[in-house]
């Protein structure tokens, strides 16, 4: 697995981008996102009702992307020690569960994909491949853990079946309009199977809901940077929403695509 870690000026720029979007995400969450989306639509105009989500896309998310690990290195690149939960607003019950985490038992059980569920997948170092499944559905694959997420636009409704590791995701465009520079994709995910926010057993429950914002930032060299703001809400194991960002650099081809199975540790 290859990861990209910027240095010098690029490191500083990317870190500032990350900080900016954490703040922005918090503002969005507090404002219930609707008012901001309305304001953005006023600038860029809403897409025509006759357009499909694919045709109306205000930003280009398709292609191959590699994660850039500029923060939380010790949680994302190595398996953190039991008890190292810094930054996660855990409830006492969540801490009790995490303190009992045993990687050997996880491996023995065969249930080793708990840290590859939707709330944690974009924190796993690796690559993403994003394509349009059809005019209404965006497909995201990860080589790490061989996971697939489906983002459904329009009035799609989940099947109401069993909870799954990637859940049911409903997507919508916010702001902009095709050709705009300030659009975003908002994804709301529910019906999740319980899993881990981090490799060392930090839990999230099946009551978890996930809100994500996908945006594209143009870097000084003209290359695109995908910034994903991830807001995890879990009334069972989190005292407040857990807000993080992940960044991805676009790659020209699938030359470095390397599917690997889930693992309980790194």
Give short role names for the model-derived ranges.
Residues 28-29:
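Repetitive helical segments and hydrophobic/amphipathic motifs
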Residues 1-17:
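Short, Lys/Arg-enriched N-terminal segments with co-localized hydrophobic residues
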Residues 21-22, 32-266:
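PEST-like low-complexity, intrinsically disordered acidic/proline/serine-rich tracts
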